[in-house]
Amino acid sequence: MDDKYTPYGGGNTRLQIAKELFAEGDQRFAQLRVIVKEWPGDAQVITAHLVENELRADITFWEKARGVHQFRIELEREQQKPLTAGELNRELRARGLNYGVKTIQNFTFATEELAPVGPWLKSTQVNEVTRPKVSALLELGAKLGQGKAMREQLQVVMHQYGDALRLRAKSNEDLEAAERLPVELDDAALLADLQLAAVQELG
């Protein structure tokens, strides 16, 4: 496909299916009739893909968080102003994505503070445990005048966990299915190590 054209609003899925059918010998898909429209802006295209992805049962919390984060960046650039969580909620709803304000806040916190372990985050855990505890540590550091140092120490710990999980996933590629180790974030261990790092930072 020419670089100046891109599928829109679910087109990626349909295009992939058409390619597979053509590869199997179905000549009806040798050519496709398409409608060419003016580019509506990056923000609109991002939400169209998010709506498409919502139909997938396997879409992860992190994929949603990153998509909403990218949408926010593009929409703020287009509108030339920052958006509150409430405003972002309304913009997403207008485009068919019904994420609540608290969910959007969790997405934002994950992309800003939990990115090193992002691919292994679970929605419920972030909402009920991880975000409240990490927020408390960050707030404590800020109150004691060590906000930047505290955040850096917490990021070091999260990078260690993220690197270990990526290494395990890579090692699993060379193993039979029955031999593979689960690649899951141990939330309790992570939070314990984050708290220890915070204590050490504060002395």
Which residues make up each language-model segment?
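Amphipathic, charge-rich alpha-helical segments that serve as recognition/docking helices
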Residues: 25-90
